[in-house]
Protein backbone atom coordinates (compact mmCIF):
# COMPACT_ATOMS: atom_id res chain seq x y z
CA UNK A 1 0.00 0.00 0.00
CA UNK A 2 2.75 2.46 0.91
CA UNK A 3 4.48 1.89 -2.42
CA UNK A 4 1.23 2.58 -4.25
CA UNK A 5 0.78 5.81 -2.28
CA UNK A 6 4.34 6.91 -3.08
CA UNK A 7 3.86 6.02 -6.75
CA UNK A 8 0.63 8.00 -6.80
CA UNK A 9 2.34 11.00 -5.18
CA UNK A 10 5.25 10.77 -7.63
CA UNK A 11 2.84 10.63 -10.58
CA UNK A 12 0.84 13.55 -9.19
CA UNK A 13 4.00 15.65 -8.74
CA UNK A 14 5.20 14.65 -12.22
CA UNK A 15 1.93 15.99 -13.65
CA UNK A 16 1.35 18.98 -11.33
CA UNK A 17 4.84 20.55 -11.44
CA UNK A 18 5.12 20.94 -15.26
CA UNK A 19 1.48 22.11 -15.38
CA UNK A 20 2.09 24.74 -12.69
CA UNK A 21 5.28 25.81 -14.48
CA UNK A 22 3.41 26.24 -17.77
CA UNK A 23 0.62 28.19 -16.03
CA UNK A 24 3.14 30.54 -14.38
CA UNK A 25 5.02 30.97 -17.66
CA UNK A 26 1.74 31.66 -19.48
CA UNK A 27 0.67 34.19 -16.85
CA UNK A 28 4.01 36.01 -17.03
CA UNK A 29 3.81 36.10 -20.83
CA UNK A 30 0.35 37.68 -20.73
CA UNK A 31 1.56 40.46 -18.44
Swiss-Prot record:
Membrane-topology annotation of the record: Single-pass membrane protein
UniProt GO BP: photosynthesis, light reaction
GO terms for cellular component: chloroplast thylakoid membrane; photosystem II
Keywords carried by this UniProt record: Chloroplast, Membrane, Photosynthesis, Photosystem II, Plastid, Reaction center, Thylakoid, Transmembrane, Transmembrane helix
SUPFAM superfamilies, sorted: Photosystem II reaction center protein M, PsbM
RNA-binding among keywords: no
Transmembrane segments: 5-25
Localization in the cell: Plastid, Chloroplast thylakoid membrane
Entry function: One of the components of the core complex of photosystem II (PSII). PSII is a light-driven water:plastoquinone oxidoreductase that uses light energy to abstract electrons from H(2)O, generating O(2) and a proton gradient subsequently used for ATP formation. It consists of a core antenna complex that captures photons, and an electron transfer chain that converts photonic excitation into a charge separation. This subunit is found at the monomer-monomer interface.
Similarity field: Belongs to the PsbM family.
HAMAP family reported in the protein's UniProt record: PSII_PsbM (MF_00438)
Subunit structure: PSII is composed of 1 copy each of membrane proteins PsbA, PsbB, PsbC, PsbD, PsbE, PsbF, PsbH, PsbI, PsbJ, PsbK, PsbL, PsbM, PsbT, PsbX, PsbY, PsbZ, Psb30/Ycf12, at least 3 peripheral proteins of the oxygen-evolving complex and a large number of cofactors. It forms dimeric complexes.
Name of the protein: Photosystem II reaction center protein M
Organism: Mesostigma viride (Green alga)
